């Protein structure tokens, strides 16, 4: 049994079904760049897999077995590997979310200003005690650090089918700041009115992201999306 077949079998046991072509390309890359091809483990492959687009790296065997949006009171027992396209907090008003996200964006800017000022101080410039509101911004963000009630997700499988998932109970690792492209393993999940009912017992967060999707998304692009959604509700 060659290395590709061995790794593919081991990954399948973990609930992940990779495309042989993608796996072989990864092994060739590792052998050439890092000289680790002979010692490649399933855990190492997973590090690259969670950073990939599962439409390109995994097979349809790990996808939803039918059109999810058309199902009701159906349980999907097999393991699905999915990636997060969007996260929405539906237990907190959009207005409150925007207040929190704007405070967070302001904090990022103030931290940048603070770093620049410290560089100037080390250069011999006069030190200033005013933190330009950094403390106030930190306090504001800290108050919103538990900005989590119930999340609704847009999920995608290896066939490119997209559908909703809803937290029935809080799942650690799912919140507004979750990276787009984060991978999940979902097993034995109930579908109600076309929505996956997610909880910690049927959902495992693998992590990762898709760089193209996630770049500059949180909080900058998320703020713009929420503003657009808010304006539609007022129209």
Curated annotation (Swiss-Prot):
Family according to the record: Belongs to the RMI1 family.
Name of the featured protein: RecQ-mediated genome instability protein 1
Originating species: Schizosaccharomyces pombe (strain 972 / ATCC 24843) (Fission yeast)
Primary site of residence: cytoplasm
Record GO cellular component, one term: cytoplasm
Name of a matching Pfam family: RMI1_N_N
UniProt key word Magnesium: no
Example GO molecular function: four-way junction DNA binding
Top-level taxon in the UniProt lineage: Eukaryota
